[in-house]
């Protein structure tokens, strides 16, 4: 009976956190929409990206503490019970929005994972959960964050279960992760946010040719994911070696991004660049779209901007 009560308590806590995560995801996504509208109204906003980079670096250095570890501390929290700073969620929310506002090429999944993991980790600690129960709550928070921020609760559930232990699923977290991912997404949609929907007009026959192309694409995408993680790693390493002052490194890194946007006309690659999915589905993608987005994103994140999904070298998302 005690074990059943503990399981119920874990599930109830996870579900309550997922409702809050749904609210946060709604607010976060609306802020990103407002940032995109601002960039459309003021196309030259990227000239202030170096200022945003300096402020971000300064705040994280002075009051961020372990928050600067980003997703890695969430992974350690789920696996080893590492304490997550309470300020992590608010810092990554605010500075991701600022980066988007001034034209940085960053995403939303890294921010969502950090917010969801930070929220559930601190709630679990406050309520006295330990070991596997605590880990399950944190994993459900990651699932609810991913599912609600993308509107993909099924994928979010698996992401939460697998992201902390690449290649293996946490069996005890299956029900909480699925329930929380769907509930958080329901809350986000209930509040009125409309996620993008990408219709597949026709499904090809599952024959040998399709399987071959599918496997080749999977290998290529895995390699691109690996190159993305390595790109961020080595850009960060280069800046740290060239510039001893962290504020100067952030300023120069952001300035390079701004100059590239200006010189090459890369305004369309600022922020999320969700238009790229639409052109891909329509078959209208240009050959330079992917390299341009890759370059701008790696340089933005390498300069120190938040909202990244780069994990430890042996646990990158490209290994999933």
Regions found by a protein language model. Give the residues of each.
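Alpha-helical transmembrane segments and immediately membrane-proximal extracytoplasmic
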Residues: 1-318
């Amino acid at each position: 009976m005690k074990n059943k009560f503990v399981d119920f308590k874990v599930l109830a806590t996870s579900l309550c956190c997922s409702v809050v995560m749904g609210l946060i995801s709604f607010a976060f996504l609306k802020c990103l929409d407002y940032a995109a509208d601002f960039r459309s109204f003021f196309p030259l906003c990227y000239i202030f990206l170096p200022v945003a980079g300096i402020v971000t670096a300064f705040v994280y250095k002075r009051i961020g503490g372990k928050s600067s570890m980003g997703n890695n501390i969430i992974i350690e929290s789920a696996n080893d019970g590492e304490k997550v700073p309470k300020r992590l969620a608010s810092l990554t929310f605010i500075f991701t929005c600022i980066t988007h506002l001034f034209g940085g090429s960053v995403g939303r999944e890294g921010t969502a994972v950090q917010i969801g993991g930070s929220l559930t980790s601190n709630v679990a600690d406050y309520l006295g959960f330990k070991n596997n129960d605590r880990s399950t709550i944190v994993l459900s928070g990651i699932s609810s964050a991913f599912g609600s921020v993308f509107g993909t609760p099924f994928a979010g559930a698996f992401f939460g279960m697998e992201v902390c232990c690449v290649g293996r699923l946490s069996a005890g977290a299956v029900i909480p992760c699925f329930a929380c991912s769907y509930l958080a997404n329901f809350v986000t949609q209930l509040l009125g946010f409309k996620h993008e929907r990408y219709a597949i007009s026709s499904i090809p026959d599952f024959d040998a040719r399709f399987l071959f192309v599918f496997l080749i694409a999977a290998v290529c995408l895995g390699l691109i994911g690996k190159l993305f993680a390595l790109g961020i790693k080595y850009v960060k390493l280069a800046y740290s070696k060239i510039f001893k002052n962290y504020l100067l490194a952030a300023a120069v890194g952001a300035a390079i991004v701004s100059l590239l946007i200006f010189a090459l006309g890369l305004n369309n690659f600022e922020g999320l660049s969700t238009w790229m999915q639409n052109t891909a589905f329509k078959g209208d993608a240009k050959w330079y779209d992917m390299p341009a987005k890759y370059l701008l994103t790696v340089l933005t994140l390498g300069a120190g901007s938040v909202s990244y999904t780069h994990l430890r070298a042996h646990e990158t998302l490209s290994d999933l």
